[in-house]
Amino acid sequence: MRIINLIVVHCSATRGDCTLSPEDLDRLHRRRGFNGTGYHYYIRKDGTVHLTRPIDRIGAHVRGFNAHSIGICYEGGLDCRGRPADTRTPAQWSSLWQLVNLLLEKFPACRVCGHRDLSPDRNGNGEIEPEEWIKACPCFEVKDEFGTSAT
């Protein structure tokens, strides 16, 4: 089993009025040259959690951090106009919370962060600020919900 020390939360960057099945997600990732879905888990709007990549297989979800991380993606992340927004349904919120806590029981040394929290600290102040984000993903403050961060 590989060493896991990071859980990274993502959004699929799909509009709130659209759906993206696990099969659609897999197809999108294959078109980008990956050998399947890069995330380990995918959470649908109804809260269903799909295992999309075995945990023992290195993910393809955040360059430079894949070897020792688990990627979780929720369906959504954009409002109906295509702007970044926390579009999680109550069912997604609950499923994400349960999944992260289950993974923290299995990997207690893990830190939990959002994809954007792994952006480079361009001004060197020790904090990743909105103007430094490479992308807005997952469109909510992961550290506020899970109390840990990548720093």
Residue ranges and their predicted role:
Residues M1-V8, S12, K45-V49, N66-H68, ...:
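Basic/polar, cationic surfaces and motifs that engage anionic cell-wall
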Residues M1-R57, N66:
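Short, conserved "active-site rim" segments that organize catalytic pockets and cofactor/ligand binding
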Residues I72:
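Ligand-binding face of N-terminal immunoglobulin V-set domains in extracellular IgSF glycoproteins
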Residues D56-R63, N101:
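Short amphipathic alpha-helices and their capping/turn segments at secondary-structure boundaries
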